[in-house]
Curated annotation (Swiss-Prot):
Name of the protein in question: Putative membrane protein insertion efficiency factor
Record keywords, A-Z: Cell inner membrane, Cell membrane, Membrane
Main location per the UniProt record: membrane
Highest classification ranks of the organism: Bacteria, Pseudomonadati, Pseudomonadota, Gammaproteobacteria, Alteromonadales
SMART domains: Haemolytic
Annotated source species: Shewanella sediminis (strain HAW-EB3)
Amino acid sequence: MAKTQSPLQWLATTLIRGYQVFISPFLGANKCRFHPTCSTYAIEAIRLHGFAKGSWLAARRILKCHPLHPGGIDPVPPKKHRCNK
């Protein structure tokens, strides 16, 4: 069963997809030094962690994307479940 997105999650992921389809192709192929790309990471983070935390994770990731950072494989961290015992 698919989890429904909040309106903010939907808006953010739609805007990022728009960037991927309409803007990114004109910036050159494979400019991102990370795998997955920063935009794919942002979509995954927002879908998994929600709008607020996912956006924070995406912003941190984008701030790491510069020539002095080596890049590499950087997956979205898994969601931590709270134990209410």
